[in-house]
Amino acid sequence: MLTLPAPAKLNLMLHIVGRRADGYHELQTLFQFLDHGDELSFSPREDGEIRLHTELPGVDHDSNLIVRAARLLQHESGCPQGADIHLLKRLPMGGGIGGGSSDAATALLGLNHLWQLHLEEDQLAELGLTLGADVPVFVRGRAAFAEGVGERLQPVELPEPWFLVIAPQVSVSTAEIFADPELTRNTPAITVRSLLAGGGHNDCQPIVEKRYPEVRNALSLLNKFVPASMTGTGACVFGSFPNEGEADKVRRQLPDTLPSFVARGRNVSMLHRCLEKLAQEVSA
């Protein structure tokens, strides 16, 4: 059995710099991975079937991104094998930290390894893009500055602090936020250099705070300890700390009713670290 992580990511900032003729928004965002996430385990099947096993209630099997990713890879590669896929879900649904997209990317990379397809990263990222705009981010597995609708990625080296992530018990509708007439859509474009020097904010945050008091309250609570931000369109919010101890000290002061976790920022995703280790073991 092959077991691999599906790590979370944080959007450390999100600027909306314009709107295209097709209705999509032009974005600038900076993201980094976390050493915390879901976990997928893969076993080959000889009958060609894809079977997802999870304890999550209400998950439609055929429309799940993991199953769609696996079937897409089967179809595009002509692979006759199937797989049993076991999902251990740790990340909140609809939290803006990439749970579904990360799961899909781990399915693509994991099955590429399990089935010995030897597809290149570029090919897998291209397949991932047909599943969702964020999937290539996880396929690439490098902290990056993203532009366009998120498809133009420029790898960056960032500090790797510890983060406290709070998951308000609400699922934010991304479509609803991007359709809000009060959303800022003309933030001046920023260069990577300016951004790394300390610029950047989240244009979606004021809209989400207005519509979702749960997110507003979580930000207010975390702001008592460190500057707090929202990732993507929410609902998760985060603050950074110089070490695990300080982050955990604040986490222990949060209400038990507010789910949270502490994780370290990573410029190379834990998925890629695992795959590199596997490749080294094979070649040894």
Swiss-Prot record:
It comes from the Bacteria. One of its GO terms (biological process) is isopentenyl diphosphate biosynthetic process, methylerythritol 4-phosphate pathway. GO terms for molecular function: 4-(cytidine 5'-diphospho)-2-C-methyl-D-erythritol kinase activity; ATP binding. Pathway: Isoprenoid biosynthesis; isopentenyl diphosphate biosynthesis via DXP pathway; isopentenyl diphosphate from 1-deoxy-D-xylulose 5-phosphate: step 3/6. Transmembrane segments: none annotated. The keyword Transmembrane helix does not apply. The active site is at K9, D134. Its EC number is 2.7.1.148. Keywords: ATP-binding, Isoprene biosynthesis, Kinase, Nucleotide-binding, Transferase. It catalyses: 4-CDP-2-C-methyl-D-erythritol + ATP = 4-CDP-2-C-methyl-D-erythritol 2-phosphate + ADP + H(+). InterPro entries: GHMP_kinase_C_dom, GHMP_kinase_C_sf, GHMP_kinase_N_dom, IspE, Ribosomal_Su5_D2-typ_SF, Ribsml_uS5_D2-typ_fold_subgr. ATP binds at P92, M93, G94, G95, G96, I97, G98, G99, G100, S101, S102. Belongs to the GHMP kinase family. IspE subfamily. NCBIfam families: ispE, PRK14608.1. Catalyzes the phosphorylation of the position 2 hydroxy group of 4-diphosphocytidyl-2C-methyl-D-erythritol. PANTHER family: 4-DIPHOSPHOCYTIDYL-2-C-METHYL-D-ERYTHRITOL KINASE, CHLOROPLASTIC (PTHR43527:SF2). This is 4-diphosphocytidyl-2-C-methyl-D-erythritol kinase. It comes from Stutzerimonas stutzeri (strain A1501). The gene is ispE.
